[in-house]
Swiss-Prot record:
Protein name: Probable protein E5
Protein keywords: Early protein
Superkingdom per UniProt: Viruses
Family: Belongs to the papillomaviridae E5 protein family.
Natural source organism: Human papillomavirus type 5b
Length: 168
């Protein structure tokens, strides 16, 4: 039987609180962005299921990296939601990732959607549940920016030309 020392327990608690803090802050920012987006009136709503490329500054090259973004349908009336497909590329996570994630955050602020809904929640890990499949958030992943960046919502843009639309 492994007995946890007070130190272990203390460390675990500190880490847990730290994660909780990061998560709360991320969600808070997300809510603020979403509210700002709702105030923006966009004449034409983004069509459903249109692949959109989001430009993210690439720290290692002069070119911008195109992160594929997908506009998905949501049943609640006029609301649309954008989810970033797949993971943030590995090279964006290393080295100057801190700088990059700030840039990504700014880019996401710019990206505006017609009444955006927030879908930043923790995915429940269970294989036997029916219903829509929720993207899993693994425990090892630092729940903050990577998950938020991947999972979050993106807002639409006042200047639509910054978004390049792909062909279905």
């Amino acid at each position: 039987l492994h007995v946890q020392t007070a130190h272990h327990i203390k460390t675990a608690t500190t880490n847990r609180n730290q994660r909780k803090k990061v998560r709360t802050e991320a969600l808070q920012q997300v809510k603020e962005i979403a509210n700002a987006a709702k105030a923006i009136k966009v004449p034409t709503p983004v069509p459903v299921s249109v692949p959109v490329a989001l430009q993210v500054p690439n720290p290692h090259h002069l070119v911008h990296h195109q992160v594929p973004v997908h506009v998905g349908r949501q049943d609640s009336g006029p609301y649309k939601q954008i989810a970033i497909q797949g993971k943030v590329p590995k090279y964006l996570q290393k080295g100057r990732w801190k700088v990059t994630q700030a840039a990504i955050k700014v880019t996401l602020h710019l990206l505006l959607l017609h009444h955006t809904t927030v879908t930043a929640g923790t995915g429940r890990k269970s294989n036997n549940q029916r219903g829509p499949r929720v993207e899993r958030v693994t425990r090892r992943e630092p729940w903050g920016e990577i998950a938020a960046t991947r999972k979050v919502i993106l807002l639409l843009l006042p200047r639509p030309q910054t978004v390049t639309r792909g062909v279905c």
